[in-house]
Amino acid sequence: MRMKHPWNAGWWFRPGKAEDAFLSDDWIGPSAAHSPKNKTIISKEISQTDDAKNKTEDWKQIHLPHDMIEAPFNAFDERSFLRWGCYAKELKKEEILKITEGLDKKTSINRYPAIFLSFEGVSVSCRVWVNGRLACSHKGPYTPFEIRIDTFIPHTWLEEQSKEQGSKAERARPIWVLVEVDSAEDSGIPPFGGVVDYLAYGGIYRGVSLCADLGARMSKLWAIPRPRGDALDGPWLVHISAEIEALESGSINNCSLLARLYLSGELVNEGNILLSDSTRIEEKNKFSANFSMSVDRPKLWDIDSPALYDLELALFSEMGQELDYEQLRIGFRTAEFGSSGFYLNQRRIFLRGLDRHQEYPYIGYAMGPDGQRRDAEILKEELGCIIVRTSHYPQSPHFLDACDELGLLVFEELPGWQHIGGREWQEQALHDLEDMIVRDRNHPSIVLWGVRINESKDNHEFYARTNELARRLDPYRQTGGVRCQARSELLEDVYTFNDFIYDGKGTMYISEPAKVLPKYRKRAPYLITEHTGHMFPTKRFDQEERLVEHALRHAHILDTAMGNSRVAGCIGWCAFDYHTHKDFGSGDRICYHG
C-alpha cells in the first residue's frame, strides 16, 4: 500500500551552486551549522578555514513552496532572477517509519520499502543528490518528476531495528537530500530561446511529497467516462487504465487491480482485472492494465453542478494483501467543439473566459493551494468566466483541482511563447506535452489540449508530432493551437486564434472566422483565445475614463462574438497583471493587461 506525505517543511536554502563540501556522503548539513553546540564539530570535521565554515553557515531555513528571490513589486532588473540556488533537507528515520508504518510487510519479499520523492515543479532546471550521490536531473519549470531514493541509502539505515545492525557511525550519519536549482532562461528549454513576455522566476515553487511502497506500484492512472450511446441519461462506461510495475524480484502476474467508484461516499460500482490478463510492457515485470465498469444514469459534471466521483484503485497480491492504493476524482460529461460552437453535455455554451498567468507579486510562482484556489474563485464567481486558458504552460494541480470543484472549464497548453527551437528543444517540448497530459487528463474541467507554441509560425513536422502525441495519450479530447496569423495550417481540431483587430476605432470588434480559417477547413471549430490586453493596458489606479473604456472594449468584443454562431467562445487577455522583461509592458516590468 502506498503511503504519501507532504515534505515541504524544514528545508534549508542558500544562493549559489552546489559545492563539493555539500556533495560528500559525510556532509553534516546546514542544520548542524546553525546549532551552537556543533560549531566546534563542524570546524573539526569539515575544515578550519573560514571559507568552508561559510559554506554551511550562510543557509537559511525555509518552507516550500519557495522562490529563490523575493521580487520587488515593480521596477526591478529581471536578470536578478537568473541565478543558482541550493535546497537541502535531512531525511529523518522517523519520517521513514511514519510513512511505512501502514505498509503490510508480509506483502513484500524485500523488507525494505521503496522510497520516492515527488516534485510538482522546480524552475527552471535542477539536479538532485541523495546521500552525496547524484540521483536525478530535470529540465523544465512546469512539469513534475519523481525519484526513487532508497537505492542511495544504506539498508542498515533503513532497517527499523538498526541499533543491532551496521556500524555506529553509519547508523548515526544523517542522510541529506540536496537540490541544485538553475533558474537561467536556458535556450534549450521551452519557453526560452527567443523573447518571452513573462518570467519563470526560480526555485522549488511547488510542493514535494515523500512516498513509500512495498512490492509493486501503479502509475499513469487514467479513468475516462463515456456514454454507451447517444443519450446521456442512460448507461455509461468508465474506461480505466494503469501501468503496474514490480519494485523487487518476484512476479506480479497473479496480482489483481480492483476499482471502486463512489459518489458522496456511497459505492456506485466496482470492477477488477487480473494482471495475467493484461499486457506485459517490453518484457519487463511491468504491465498495462485496461478494463471498464458500467455506471447507470450518473450525475453529470457541469459548469453549474460539477458532480465529482471518487475512484479508488487498489492493487492486491495473489494472497489478497494490498500492495498499492490510489484515488482519483473524475466527472461524467461530454465536451465537443463543432462548427456551430462548443457543446457541454450536448448543450451549446458560449465560452466566455480569460487567460491566466500563475504568478503573484513578491513571491513569483511560489503560491500554495489556498492562493491557487482563490484565483479560480475570482475567475468563476467574481469575473463570471466559464473557461480559463492556462497561458502559456501547465499550471498548479491545486488550481486545476479548484476548477474541477467550481465547474470552471480549462484550455491547457504546453510551455512556449512564439519561439520554436531546434531538435533538442522540440524533443523537450514533446516531453513537456506528454507530462502535462498524463498528469492532468483525469480533470473533467479540461476540455482542450493546446499543442502549438503560443503565436508561433507553422511547423508541419513538429506540430504533426504534437497532435499525434496528444491524440494517442488522450483520444477523447480535442486539440487546439494558439496562433496569431490568419490562414495558418490547421492540424488541430479547433482553430484557436488571438484576435487583436479592434484598436478602439470603428465597429470591427472581431475578425470574421471565414477570413481567418484556412480555405480547406472553412467549417472548422473556431475559438478566440486572446483580445484587448496589450492593445489597451489599464492600471487599477488609472482615471475613471480609462477604466470604463477598458470595460467597454471587453464588452463590445464579447457581445459581437456571442452574436456569431461560428465563434465557440472568446477568451480575453488576461485575468491578472503580471511581471515581464524589459522589452514588454509599461516600462516598470509589469504588463497591466489584467
Task: Give the residues covered by each predicted segment.
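Accessory carbohydrate-binding/adhesion or oligomerization-edge regions at the termini
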Residues: M1-P72, E180, A184, A551, ...
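Accessory beta-strand-rich segments of carbohydrate-active enzymes
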Residues: H5, W12-G16, L82-K220, L247, ...
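Beta-sandwich strand segments
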Residues: D20-D26, D186-Y198, M319-Q327
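Active-site-adjacent substrate/metal-binding segments within catalytic domains
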Residues: P65-K93, R111-F119, S123-V130, C136, ...
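Structural beta-strand segments of beta-rich domains
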Residues: P113-I115, G234-A242
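Extended acidic/polar, glycine-enriched regions
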Residues: P154-H155, K168-A172, S241-F337
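Substrate-binding/catalytic cleft of secreted carbohydrate-active enzymes
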Residues: E381, I387-G594
